[in-house]
């Protein structure tokens, strides 16, 4: 090494990163960022200072495709060197047609391919003594909660969805690896784990629920056994994307025991048997209502969230009203709904009798108006109750927290009027003073 080179060592390469899409994509981004930091790359907060930019895209619906393509274009304009990954990356021709100058394109869950592309265009720094990576990896979420992905892909072929064609069939992570990651997160200060996958309740079915090992003891690769083990960490464990298999009923006693949060994110999608069959979804709303009653009997505090599609091809007014009747009887706590939108490659596109957009929108508004009344009534009974909440943010006006019934970003929040002694990540015991459609207002106890 010459004197000049020792005085002016090579600059550490910087990578810009943009993460779009759902929590599953967020976990993919976290894995790539963790690898980058482990190899000594710096993460640039802006395009200008980056040597190249990675864009993790979403391609689920048309608006997501448009946002992804726009973001790629922005990164090319501001930086010029862009690597594309994620769900839209499974359609390389779409990306290349819009932006032929991108350096490389990979599909989702392709950490090794992304890193190989980065190495090719921006060689990694050489400093074996530099330890940049915390044990829990690089996270895009606040320090007190984290998403934990337990599998990739999906074995279902719902006619409105193209995720299996982008992310492949179900591949479950080894149960020991999942629990090791959970332990690392807990040791790093995480107080809430949000368990995610394309189909959380199918965990282990691809490997016939093979028995794995965790700290020397056997644990089946199955959602009930995994949930039971996660419950031993003594933190909040929240389940998302739970397909309504019969064995989901086994999870409710764990919620009643306090091992899992009494919260179930379970997408029913519709209530009419014919529409559900066209969707290739479970088609027995009567059985669903019986199960909901049993869940509430076993765990009275359970909060139920679901999603629904309105205006699916062929949906009649009577079939839509059947969905409204189901919602009235089910009395779900949280509901998300959207109008059916044709997605390139989805089997439902070829179904006859597509519902006109204006009728779709009218039905969506009717559904949400009805559900708002239900949600408001279900929250109103909490007035005067005491709750333990997890604080997300604090400012001069107070604190914003979440209860067991509130997942980050998709549900309501809990406002605390006095935040003088609180900081993000704190637990707080509060009393509910007021409620509305989605949120609670509280005072510290």
Swiss-Prot record:
Domain Radical SAM core: from-to ranges: 140-377
Keyword Iron: yes
Record carries keyword Ribonucleoprotein: no
Reactions accelerated catalytically: L-aspartate(89)-[ribosomal protein uS12]-hydrogen + (sulfur carrier)-SH + AH2 + 2 S-adenosyl-L-methionine = 3-methylsulfanyl-L-aspartate(89)-[ribosomal protein uS12]-hydrogen + (sulfur carrier)-H + 5'-deoxyadenosine + L-methionine + A + S-adenosyl-L-homocysteine + 2 H(+)
An example Gene Ontology CC term for this record: cytosol
Cofactor: [4Fe-4S] cluster
Binding site for [4Fe-4S] cluster 2: 154, 158, 161
EC number per UniProt: 2.8.4.4
Domain MTTase N-terminal, first and last residues per copy: 13-123
Free-text cofactor note: Binds 2 [4Fe-4S] clusters. One cluster is coordinated with 3 cysteines and an exchangeable S-adenosyl-L-methionine.
GO biological process per UniProt: tRNA modification
Localisation per UniProt entry: Cytoplasm
Keywords: 4Fe-4S, Cytoplasm, Iron, Iron-sulfur, Metal-binding, S-adenosyl-L-methionine, Transferase
TRAM domain ranges (all copies): 380-445
Ranges annotated as spanning the membrane: none
Single GO term (MF): metal ion binding
Positions that bind [4Fe-4S] cluster 1: 22, 58, 87
Main location (coarse class): cytoplasm
Annotated family: Belongs to the methylthiotransferase family. RimO subfamily.
Biological role: Catalyzes the methylthiolation of an aspartic acid residue of ribosomal protein uS12.
Designated name of the protein: Ribosomal protein uS12 methylthiotransferase RimO
Source organism per UniProt: Nitrosomonas eutropha (strain DSM 101675 / C91 / Nm57)
């Amino acid at each position: 090494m010459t004197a000049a080179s020792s005085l002016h060592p090579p600059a550490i390469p910087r990578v810009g990163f943009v993460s779009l899409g759902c929590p599953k994509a967020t976990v993919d981004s976290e894995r790539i960022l963790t690898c980058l930091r482990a190899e000594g790359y710096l993460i640039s907060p802006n395009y200008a200072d980056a040597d190249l930019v990675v864009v993790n895209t979403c391609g689920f619906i048309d608006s997501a495709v448009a946002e992804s393509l726009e973001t790629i274009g922005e990164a090319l304009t501001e930086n010029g060197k862009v690597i594309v990954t994620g769900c839209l990356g499974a359609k390389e021709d779409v990306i290349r047609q819009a932006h032929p100058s991108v350096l490389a394109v990979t599909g989702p869950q392709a950490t090794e391919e992304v890193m190989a592309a980065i190495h090719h265009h921006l060689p990694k720094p050489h400093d074996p003594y530099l330890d940049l990576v915390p044990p829990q990896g690089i996270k895009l979420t606040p320090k007190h909660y984290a998403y934990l992905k337990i599998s990739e892909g999906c074995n279902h072929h719902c006619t409105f969805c193209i995720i299996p064609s982008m992310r492949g069939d179900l591949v479950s992570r080894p149960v020991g690896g999942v629990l090791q990651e959970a332990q690392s997160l807990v040791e790093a200060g995480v107080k809430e784990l949000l368990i995610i996958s394309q189909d959380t309740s199918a965990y282990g079915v691809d490997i016939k629920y093979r028995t794995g090992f965790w700290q020397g003891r056997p644990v089946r690769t199955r959602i009930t056994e995994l949930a039971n083990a996660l419950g031993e960490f003594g933190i909040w464990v929240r389940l998302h994307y739970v397909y309504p298999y019969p064995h989901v009923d086994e999870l409710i006693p764990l919620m009643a025991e306090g091992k899992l949060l009494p919260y179930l994110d379970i997408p029913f999608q519709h209530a009419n048997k014919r529409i559900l069959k066209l969707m290739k979804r479970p088609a027995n709303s009567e059985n669903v209502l019986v199960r909901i009653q049993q869940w509430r009997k076993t765990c009275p505090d359970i909060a139920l969230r679901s999603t629904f599609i309105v205006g699916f091809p062929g949906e009649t007014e009577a079939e839509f009203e059947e969905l409204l009747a189901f919602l009235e009887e089910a009395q779900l706590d949280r509901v998300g709904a959207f109008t059916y939108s044709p997605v390139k490659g989805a089997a439902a596109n070829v179904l006859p009798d597509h519902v006109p957009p204006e009728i779709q929108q009218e039905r969506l508004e009717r559904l949400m108006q009805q559900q708002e009344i239900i949600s408001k009534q279900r929250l109103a009974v909490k007035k005067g109750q005491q709750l333990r909440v997890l604080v997300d943010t604090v400012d001069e006006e107070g604190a914003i927290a979440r209860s067991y019934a509130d997942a980050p970003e998709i549900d309501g929040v809990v406002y605390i009027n006095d935040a003088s002694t609180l900081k993000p990540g704190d637990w707080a015991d509060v009393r509910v003073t007021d409620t509305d459609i989605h949120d609670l207002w509280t005072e510290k106890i």
